[in-house]
């Protein structure tokens, strides 16, 4: 079974007097365990594709599935729920808030997501070997 299946994916942007076709009929199938690389020049649509796949942006056309689940489009709440339940996303330029401790940074993220669970935050830090760093400030 395909982990990701994309059929005719499009993402067009209206810019002043022209339409920019960032994605125009993309077809792709990624099998579970398969590794791929998105390679192309600046402005070729790599980030746009990833943003659509992770439900950070809605395509203007086409269909796509993640683990057999149709990825929601044009519905902010459904897209957020899908992202929280199915997608892990590491931003290229991710920064911690320098005036908060490691633990406080995690708790802030939880609060922004609508919950706060210090035990869970500490457990997550333990899973990545940072249990002794909770009171440190990012360097």
Language-model-detected regions and their locations in the chain:
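Walker A (P-loop) phosphate-binding loop of ABC-type ATPase nucleotide-binding domains
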Residues: 40-44
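Short coil-to-helix segment of the ABC ATPase nucleotide-binding domain corresponding to the Q-loop/switch region
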Residues: 97-109
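Conserved ABC transporter NBD signature motif
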Residues: 62-73
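Conserved ABC ATPase "signature" region
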Residues: 5, 69-70, 116-133
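ABC ATPase NBD coupling module
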Residues: 17-20, 71-88
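Helix-to-loop junction immediately C-terminal to a conserved catalytic motif
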Residues: 54
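ABC-type ATPase nucleotide-binding domains, specifically the catalytic core motifs of the NBD
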Residues: 14-16, 107-118, 127
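A short, flexible loop at the N-terminus of ABC-type nucleotide-binding domains that lies
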Residues: 1-3, 12-25, 76
């Amino acid at each position: 079974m395909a982990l990701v299946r994309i059929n005719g994916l499009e993402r067009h942007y209206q810019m002043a007097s022209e339409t920019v076709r960032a994605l125009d009929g993309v077809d792709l199938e990624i099998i579970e365990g398969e590794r791929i690389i998105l390679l192309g020049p600046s402005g070729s649509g790599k980030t746009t594709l990833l943003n659509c796949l992770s439900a950070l942006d809605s395509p203007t056309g086409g269909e796509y599935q993640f683990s057999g689940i149709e990825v929601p489009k044009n519905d902010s709440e459904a897209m957020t729920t899908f992202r929280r339940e199915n997608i892990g996303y590491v931003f290229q330029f991710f920064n911690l808030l320098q005036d908060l401790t490691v633990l406080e940074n995690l708790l802030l993220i939880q609060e922004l997501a609508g919950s706060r669970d210090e035990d869970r935050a500490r457990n997550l830090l333990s899973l990545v070997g940072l249990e002794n760093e909770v009171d440190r400030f990012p360097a």
